[in-house]
Regions:
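C-terminal non-catalytic regions of proteins with extracellular/luminal or membrane-system context
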Residues: 1-328
């Protein structure tokens, strides 16, 4: 259970020295044949740093074979974890945060600090052991937080947008928003979007392409709205991809399929103009919808629809997207 971190750095979202030593000792036992595999369970509601899962990032191989985020499961929920590890139940969840190798890569960290009130000492508010009330925190953010920042900057880098800076998504993001793994595999087909007066209806077919395990699949729908000259002139913030709907299939046996329908209200596509119109606006231009497995997959699909490829961007794009899962 995640309650501590590094005392040296004060970062409670990184491994402590004791936890690193534990992994090192487990690696030694694995190497001498005491057991075969090391599986890390992340029992935390916070998005901890995951550099220790990638030897190329952290500089040391701890011999970790798998990791599973289980959240704060409590006394009862832990019983279900055993079923997941044994394979009697197949995982079907999706991450609600972007997990980083280094949480300082989050730009909000640079707008977040703690300050003492100037007269705190006068009222004995900073005395050690007292009920400390002499500090306050200053925090600032816009929409460019979490996946909206990491995926938007990634798209800017891929497209060669001015002032995108030196940014490498693959060495920054460990697991993107919406990521989820399974003991089986799924394929999407027959993707289609229809428009009505006040909504878009997204339909697609999901097929369990595995041969052994049954499982559920979480289908995510993202959209991208046009980023216009008006938006830029008026300080309107837009992300490269926005989650606008999701649905989960029933348990699908190997080879089985299910048609999934997700409805997106047109009001979801609006953007708030705080500086000029003082209300929500809907820009003219190209809107993209895509079905994706996570936020990064969504942006790659949209980039592919715009004509971008891994080869054509000198590797700035991490993987080729699927244009069959994009509607414009």
């Amino acid at each position: 259970s995640w309650i501590s971190g590094s005392e040296a750095s004060g970062n409670y979202l990184e491994l402590s020295a004791e936890e690193i030593e534990l992994l090192q000792n487990l690696k030694a036992l694995k190497d001498n044949g005491t057991f075969k595999n090391i599986i890390v369970l992340i029992n935390s509601s916070n998005a901890i740093e995951l550099d220790f899962l990638n030897p190329e990032i952290c500089g040391e191989d701890y011999g970790i074979d798998a990791a599973m985020w289980i959240g704060d499961v409590g006394q009862t929920g832990i019983n279900g974890v055993g079923q997941l590890l044994a394979g009697t139940v197949t995982p079907s969840g999706s991450l609600v945060d972007t997990y980083l190798y280094d949480n300082l890569a989050n730009p909000a960290m640079y707008n977040f600090y703690t300050q003492a009130y100037p007269n705190a000492a006068e009222y004995n508010l900073l005395t050690e052991g007292a009920d400390v009330q002499g500090m306050y925190s200053v925090y600032q953010e816009g929409i460019y937080l979490g996946y909206r920042y990491f995926e938007t900057r990634y798209e800017d880098v891929v497209m060669g947008t001015a002032k995108a800076g030196d940014y490498d998504w693959a060495t920054t993001v460990a697991y993107p928003f919406g990521y989820g793994d399974s003991y089986t595999s799924f394929a999407y087909s027959n993707f289609n979007v229809t428009e009505s007066d006040d909504a878009f209806t997204v339909t697609l077919k999901v097929t369990n392409t595995g041969k052994t395990y049954s499982g559920k699949e979480t289908v995510q729908v993202y959209f991208q709205s046009p980023y216009t000259d008006y938006d830029k002139a008026n300080g309107i913030e837009k992300a490269a991809a926005e989650l606008c709907g999701f649905a989960k299939t029933d348990v699908l046996a190997p080879g089985a399929s299910e048609d999934v329908t997700i409805t997106v209200k047109k009001s979801e596509l609006r953007t708030y103009d705080a500086n000029n119109a003082k209300t929500y606006i809907l820009d003219a231009g190209d809107y993209y919808f895509t079905a994706a497995t996570d936020s990064h997959n969504a942006v790659n699909n949209i980039l592919a629809a715009k004509g971008y490829t891994v080869a054509g961007t000198n590797g700035r794009m991490t993987e080729d997207g699927d244009t069959s899962l994009v509607w414009k």
